[in-house]
Amino acid sequence: MRHHEWVPLDEIVRKAKMPEKDVLYRLKRLNKFGFVVRSTYGYAVSMGGYDALAINAFVKKGILKAIGNKLGVGKEGDVYTVLLSDGREAVLKFHKHGRTCFTRGKRYRGYLADKHHISWLYVSRLTAEREFEILNELFPIVKVPEPIEWNRHAIIMGKVVGEELKRLDLSEFMSKEEIKDLFWKIIEEVKKAYEIGYIHGDLSEFNILLDENGDFVIIDWPQAVPKYHPDAEFYLKRDIWNVIRYFKKYKIDKEDEKIDVDKIFEYITK
């Protein structure tokens, strides 16, 4: 999978160390259930099959007990509620990258820059691994989901509660002073992440979740870049601007001259 989208039958037979007729029988059944797909070039694991492999690995490790409802479908994956073997509720995120995401990834993500002839499933695995590693470095200092386990293209994270800022009208339940306080709390988390060594790189109202108690969590970190990245200033200033842009509709910037991209950039990086 790392080197092919389609694996030739003879290679599968060689790896399986089984008679060809037995391999074909099993491949036919896997294809029937949608776990593999077939073409004139060979066979490939389907996204559903890759999901099943990751789920099976979590179950065999004694981590996962049950999968619940789908919470949503994001730009880069599907998210489900899950029940862990220790009784905790958590979140299961499957990274799923098509050709468009991969093209974007090769252009912007350093950890994919030297990967050329690899499958889309392997790209999904790399991004999941990358996000898990970053969350491990940020949690619990930064308000991010707790990383629990990773396998293939899937990550199990601590339960996340809240709504995207995009879906909320903060003025309905917060005063202007509380809204301004929330803005600066988000900036503080951006600063903490920077001090650890990372810039989110795609921060916006779509990946900041706010709960009913006014607490928040920042999600979606696979595209994060190190603070020593050649384009670090561009990404950090873009993140800052995206947060300012969202809060501008509440006019908090009119009363606080510190709410400025360059001033906040200097504050974060000093």
From Swiss-Prot:
Keywords: ATP-binding, Kinase, Magnesium, Metal-binding, Nucleotide-binding, Serine/threonine-protein kinase, Transferase. ATP binds at residues 72-77, 93, 158-164, 206-207, 220. Residues 65-270 form the Protein kinase domain. SMART domains: RIO (SM00090). GO terms for molecular function: ATP binding; metal ion binding; protein kinase activity; protein serine kinase activity; protein serine/threonine kinase activity. Mg(2+) 1 binds at residues 76, 220. GO terms for biological process: maturation of SSU-rRNA. It catalyses: L-seryl-[protein] + ATP = O-phospho-L-seryl-[protein] + ADP + H(+); L-threonyl-[protein] + ATP = O-phospho-L-threonyl-[protein] + ADP + H(+). Mg(2+) 2 binds at residues 207, 220. Its EC number is 2.7.11.1. Pfam families: RIO1 (PF01163), Rio2_N (PF09202). PROSITE patterns: PROTEIN_KINASE_DOM, RIO1. One of its GO terms (cellular component) is cytosol. Belongs to the protein kinase superfamily. RIO-type Ser/Thr kinase family. This is RIO-type serine/threonine-protein kinase Rio2. The lineage of its organism: Archaea, Methanobacteriati, Methanobacteriota, Methanomada group, Methanococci.
